[in-house]
């Protein structure tokens, strides 16, 4: 009989987007409990060791973290298995680098470098708005932040811009047709496009139709949509490819063209 929480994670059972090879060991780092779900996060150790290649082993990552060099959303994190997730800002003071975790079109977290100015804020999706004790209204975001006394105009599914220094809302984007969004779940994960319309299905899942910059349309559930810009102007910088997914044939042609130009 299992008593208590699970403490291990086998490599084969780890999320695909961590891109860990099967043969280098049996286990994978199990993310600590935190603001993002196990299958939607990237542990700090995977980011530093496997993506940035700043360390060769888990031991080295621990030494980096214990020197308090790594900040996530402006807070020092010493836990190597801390679950960083979508929209989180990872700052390395020593090298003066800042990264934002956003998805590429293959549905993996891209190593996306950002400027110092952009590292001062993040976007959060509003998951829930409730009235707490003594009638205090508050909203809960996708990364488990609770913010009291929000603007009454802000509703569920809107996006709020948060100042990481103070934790306060500095701006917000309504969930509306014509606004730019990124897909954060499902088969279209990582695609960016403009919301064209929303189908309401009471008792089931609402469906949102999105059109990308190439004119391709696709549909996904409302829960998978994260608004990232007013009109077609994004509030964050996007990774290479700008969230436009190519077809298999287009991708092959592009690869051959680069091969010929370099060869």
Swiss-Prot record:
Gene Ontology molecular-function annotations: RNA binding; rRNA binding; structural constituent of ribosome
UniProt keyword terms in alphabetical order: Ribonucleoprotein, Ribosomal protein, RNA-binding, rRNA-binding
GO annotation, cellular component aspect: cytosolic small ribosomal subunit
A Pfam family hit: Ribosomal_S4e
Any GO BP annotation: translation
Source species, domain of life: Eukaryota
S4 RNA-binding domain segment(s): 42-104
Family: Belongs to the eukaryotic ribosomal protein eS4 family.
This protein's name: Small ribosomal subunit protein eS4, Y isoform 1
């Amino acid at each position: 009989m299992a008593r208590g929480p699970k403490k291990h994670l086998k490599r084969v059972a780890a999320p695909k987007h961590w891109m860990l090879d099967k043969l280098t060991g049996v286990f994978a780092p199990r993310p600590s409990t935190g603001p993002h779900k196990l299958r939607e996060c990237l542990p700090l150790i995977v980011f530093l060791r496997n993506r940035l290649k700043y360390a060769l082993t888990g031991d080295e990552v621990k030494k980096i973290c214990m020197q308090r060099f790594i900040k996530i959303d402006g807070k020092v994190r010493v836990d190597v298995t801390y679950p960083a997730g979508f929209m989180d800002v990872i700052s390395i003071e020593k090298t003066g680098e800042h990264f934002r975790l956003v998805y590429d079109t293959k549905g993996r977290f891209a190593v996306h470098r950002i400027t110092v100015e952009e590292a001062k804020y993040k976007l959060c999706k509003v998951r829930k708005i409730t009235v707490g004790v003594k009638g205090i209204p508050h909203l809960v975001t996708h990364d488990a932040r609770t913010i009291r006394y929000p603007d009454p105009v802000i509703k569920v599914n809107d996006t709020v811009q948060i100042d990481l220094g103070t934790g306060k809302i500095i701006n917000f984007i309504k969930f509306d047709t014509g606004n730019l969004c990124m897909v954060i779940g499902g088969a279209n994960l990582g695609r960016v496009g403009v919301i064209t319309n929303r189908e309401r299905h009471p008792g089931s899942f609402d469906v949102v139709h999105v059109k990308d910059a190439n004119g391709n349309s696709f549909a996904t559930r409302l829960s998978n949509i994260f608004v990232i810009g007013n009109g077609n102007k994004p509030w964050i910088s996007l990774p290479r490819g700008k969230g436009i997914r190519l077809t298999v044939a287009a991708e092959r042609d592009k690869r051959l063209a680069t091969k010929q130009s370099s060869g």
